[in-house]
Amino acid sequence: MSVVIRLARAGTKKRPFYHVVVADSRFPRDGRFIERLGYFNPLMAKDNEARLKLDLDKVKDWLAKGAQPSDRVARFLDTAGVRKREARNNPEKAVPRKERKAADGK
């Protein structure tokens, strides 16, 4: 059983609200979950403390058990100082058209 810490959408249409949950990766996004760890309200101001609430003790416990955080939850854990998020290796950006034509000899 692959366990994931992820966001489950709640709220109404046009008013998103997310619960931070531990769930089996095979369960639907908004379906069954094992435990609720907190919430995230994206409509609040970014500097508002009530925008994100996590039970960090439970999060650390699940990470120790092998749960993998989703990309967004990994960002939250990085800002909370629980777990360092690895930087992604972005591919090189495309070469501008002028340089491409000059390299082709046209």
UniProtKB/Swiss-Prot annotation:
One GO MF term attached to the UniProt entry: structural constituent of ribosome
Keywords: Ribonucleoprotein, Ribosomal protein
Signal peptide residue numbers: none
Protein name: Small ribosomal subunit protein bS16
InterPro entries linked: Ribosomal_bS16, Ribosomal_bS16_dom_sf
Lineage: Bacteria, Pseudomonadati, Pseudomonadota, Alphaproteobacteria, Hyphomicrobiales
HAMAP family per record: Ribosomal_bS16
BP GO terms, sorted: translation
A cellular component term, taken from the record's GO annotations: cytoplasm
Organism expressing this protein natively: Rhodopseudomonas palustris (strain ATCC BAA-98 / CGA009)
Family: Belongs to the bacterial ribosomal protein bS16 family.
Chain spans, region Disordered: 84-106
